[in-house]
Amino acid sequence: MSNVIGDRTEDGLSTAAAASGSTAVQSSPPTDRPVRVYADGIYDLFHFGHARSLEQAKLAFPNNTYLLVGCCNDETTHKYKGRTVMTAEERYESLRHCKWVDEVIPDAPWVVNQEFLDKHQIDYVAHDSLPYADSSGAGKDVYEFVKKVGRFKETQRTEGISTSDIIMRIVKDYNQYVMRNLDRGYSREDLGVSFVKEKRLRVNMRLKKLQERVKEQQERVGEKIQTVKMLRNEWVENADRWVAGFLEIFEEGCHKMGTAIVDSIQERLMRQKSAERLENGQDDDTDDQFYEEYFDHDMGSDDDEDEKFYDEEEVKEEETEKTVMTDAKDNK
């Protein structure tokens, strides 16, 4: 018989089949037909550890393998193992939906004997090599017989997963699962919870939700404070650059505004002068001459001003000479 893969301890087994660890010489598998491998167990809360152990049994031999899986009924299991979560029919049905299983044997015996092997034409029994205490009192190890006759096929366990571990997770978070089911419409009677415990659980859940909301708000406030700090640091780092840019733009605008004001004043002065000349009867030529004189005055050089100064001095000297000569004649 091949490895027993659904274990009675409800622990999962790994998928790679290992060499036999039994001291007896292992019998040779048949070559004219598929090898019939048997695996048994409780398979409560069927999980991937169970599936991997069944995969090991199915792939224990290179040729075609026919895998039979035995599952103990509720009476036998409760007597030697303890209470299960799933009923026997639920456990049988879980096994039937595993792709590695060819046949499910319900009401399997707690200890495999020669009569059972002959009845189902079993070649090998598959299970891990660790001794499994026989609580029925028939022997020290449930698989002691098949190991002695060389019809035991060893498998490896899958660490980290077992039915007991799953139950422990549920027990650990029992209150949360109770509240979840109460919120989904289950009554406290369905869950076996007293009135006082139900109220206490609801109060605790409200307090927990309040704590979660407070924590969420604190995180949001912290994020906003961090954002403000980042913006402040960015403003401080770029303040000088922003101020310099503003002053440059402001100075350029003031220069343009000053130029526009000067041009406007000059234009108004020219218009006013032109209007005065027209009132005095001067023609357009005189007006043009005024423009020329105006621009010449604005754009004239210092040399032109010097020439005008010397001309005026010469005129004054001539007038002085004339006055002196006139006075001399009068004295004569």
From Swiss-Prot:
It catalyses: phosphocholine + CTP + H(+) = CDP-choline + diphosphate. Disruption phenotype: No visible phenotype under normal growth conditions. Residues 319-332 have a biased composition (Basic and acidic residues). It holds the Pfam family CTP_transf_like. Keywords: Acetylation, Lipid biosynthesis, Lipid metabolism, Nucleotidyltransferase, Phospholipid biosynthesis, Phospholipid metabolism, Transferase. Plays an important role in the biosynthesis of the phospholipid phosphatidylcholine. Catalyzes the formation of CDP-choline. Belongs to the cytidylyltransferase family. Residues 14-28 have a biased composition (Low complexity). The gene is CCT1. Optimum temperature is 30 degrees Celsius. Residues 1-32, 276-332 are annotated as: Disordered. This is Choline-phosphate cytidylyltransferase 1. GO terms for biological process: phosphatidylcholine biosynthetic process. Substrate binds at residues 81, 110. The keyword tRNA-binding does not apply. CTP binds at residues 42-50, 81, 127-128, 132, 157-161. The modification N-acetylserine is found at residue 2. One of its GO terms (molecular function) is choline-phosphate cytidylyltransferase activity. Pathway: Phospholipid metabolism; phosphatidylcholine biosynthesis; phosphatidylcholine from phosphocholine: step 1/2. Residues 281-293, 301-318 have a biased composition (Acidic residues). InterPro entries: CCT, Cyt_trans-like, Pcy1-like, Rossmann-like_a/b/a_fold. Its EC number is 2.7.7.15.
